[in-house]
């Protein structure tokens, strides 16, 4: 398990360390990515301390890693237990923004 309170940079380094090998070993036909926002520092149930920027960078990293390796990705939103609905909606929008950027970056 990840340590409680893990912040953006450490989380993203951990993701970069494991995701490419995981994909290479499994070679999925399709990646189903649940872009939960409960790792956010403001989430009342989550145990990590990611910022909005960290969530966006995570989504970019996951999507870019998958697409660059040739794996199709389907994204869903999930998790997120903030009391401020506007903040929660914004956090859920980040994966859509990341997907749009990756789409244009890779000319899909």
What are these regions (language model features)?
Residues 1-108:
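A general "terminal functional-core" signal
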